[in-house]
Amino acid sequence: MFGFGKKDKESKKEAAAEEVLTEERKEELLRTISLKKEEIKQIAGEEQAKIYEEIGLAFYELNEEDNTIDAFEKSLQAKKSVGDGYKILLKLYNKKRAEAAKANDEKSLQIYLKKMDQMMQVSKDVTRGVR
């Protein structure tokens, strides 16, 4: 009657259409990543966090999960923040944790549970203003 708890079939179709990357977009993202990697060598501190997050977002759009995780982890090392990168990283950790649980890989499962705990600590630190 009200549609509570029911998934919108139209939004699923739209999301599937958006996931297809054109060759031009892939090339553009790879160029962006390359330029940002060069740019990051020339700066230090908190500015690096922003650029690493941009690199991570580009890798995420390319569906390169391991590179995405690496870039977002470097971003959080440079500066703790709770932005899009944080949310995507938490989502990827949860996905990796679920895959490890499904494969009965206890070692990987513990690694990703620990990483998720660290992410929760980052959230607390940012909320409290701790650096």
Outline where the language-model segments fall.
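Structural marker of alpha-solenoid helical repeat scaffolds
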Residues: 42-44, 78, 126
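Short coil turns that delineate tetratricopeptide repeat
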Residues: 45-46, 80, 121
